[in-house]
């Protein structure tokens, strides 16, 4: 059971430069996917992608969009590393909008805190031991602080700093953090979700907005809400988009991760965020699409979303 909400609107940027990009390069459109437990409601986009002889959601007719998937690679290349006995931070590819963390400790509850240039703190669980995991740098260019926190009291939710490192980050492409796979949006070129996204994008889609529409409609029509799973989500839960696709069910986090993986592999920058709407914990996504189109006709709902952790 779930309540699905699709809402498009303009996202404010933090700098004059980004506002210029917003006006000149792309339109920032937000897609909120809220999934609650009380009602079964699907707010669908009428019409899906453009069919033969019809205009696309962008209102333009031309050559179909290339549906070929593109999966950007992440790598701990070892060119720039920091760390101690517990952790290795590979910062070789900060220009691509990510760092990689290899935790080698035994603490049962570990977190990674990424402080962006504007002081916003983004906190992610660390559950991979003995291997690298990818974490995004979502705050643009500037000075970041990466901090590893280990639990000292699970009952009291207390943590101690085990490692911290300052990084000067200059991201080559501002959209890069939202195109690469990472800890929460985990996929490869061989993932089933990537193949499915490619198939959906090949169904008479003429624009990025058509692809968003097609994938969104597929997800809300074919994935059902797993109430039992929602009641027993463990600490550090990581969505598996292929598993969600195979089982046809999941929680809001699964919906958002599946759609994010499909869209990123279609070269559409997509940000997954987790946070609270009132007392309800949920996940939603935002994506960048090319300008010139008209957002799908959807039922408008108030934006009650508070700050979230993007990935």
Regions found by a protein language model. Give the residues of each.
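N-terminal accessory/pre-domain segments preceding catalytic cores
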Residues: 4, 8-13, 17-209, 295-302
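A broad, low-specificity signal for short, low-complexity segments enriched in glycine/proline
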Residues: 60-64, 73, 231-233, 243-250
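Hydrophobic/aromatic-rich core segments of domains that either
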Residues: 254-311
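Aromatic side chains
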Residues: 144, 159, 178, 216-218, ...
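Secondary-structure boundary elements
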Residues: 179-247, 295, 307
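Alpha-helix capping and helix-loop boundary segments enriched in small/acidic/polar residues
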Residues: 123, 247-250, 273-276
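Active-site nucleophilic cysteine motif
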Residues: 211-215, 247-263
């Amino acid at each position: 059971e779930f309540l699905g909400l699709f809402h498009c609107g303009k996202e404010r940027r933090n700098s004059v430069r980004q506002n210029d990009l917003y006006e000149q390069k792309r339109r920032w459109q937000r897609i909120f996917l809220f999934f609650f437990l009380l009602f079964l409601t699907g707010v669908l986009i009428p019409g899906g992608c453009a069919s033969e002889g019809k205009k696309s959601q962008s209102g333009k007719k031309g050559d179909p969009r290339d549906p070929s998937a593109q999966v950007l690679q992440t790598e701990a290349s070892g060119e720039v590393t920091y760390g101690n006995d517990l952790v290795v931070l590979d910062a070789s590819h900060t220009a691509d909008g990510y760092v990689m963390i290899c935790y080698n400790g035994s603490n049962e509850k570990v977190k990674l805190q990424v402080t962006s240039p504007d002081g916003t703190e983004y906190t992610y669980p660390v559950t991979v031991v003995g291997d690298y995991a990818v974490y995004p740098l979502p705050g643009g260019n500037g000075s970041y602080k990466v901090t590893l926190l280990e639990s000292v009291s699970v009952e009291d939710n207390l943590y101690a700093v085990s490692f911290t490192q300052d990084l000067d980050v200059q991201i080559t492409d501002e959209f890069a953090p939202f195109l690469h796979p990472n800890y929460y949006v985990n996929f490869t070129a061989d993932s089933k979700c990537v193949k499915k996204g490619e198939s959906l994008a090949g169904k008479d889609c003429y624009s990025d907005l058509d692809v968003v529409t097609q994938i969104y409609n597929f997800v809300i029509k074919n994935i059902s809400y797993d109430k039992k799973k929602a009641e027993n989500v463990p600490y550090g839960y990581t969505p598996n988009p292929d598993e969600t696709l195979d089982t046809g069910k999941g929680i809001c986090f699964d919906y958002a991760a599946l759609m994010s993986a499909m869209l990123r592999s279609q070269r559409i920058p997509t940000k997954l965020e987790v946070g609270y709407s009132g007392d309800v914990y949920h996940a939603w996504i935002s994506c960048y699409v090319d300008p010139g189109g008209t957002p799908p006709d959807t039922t408008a709902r108030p934006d009650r979303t508070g700050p979230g952790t993007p990935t």
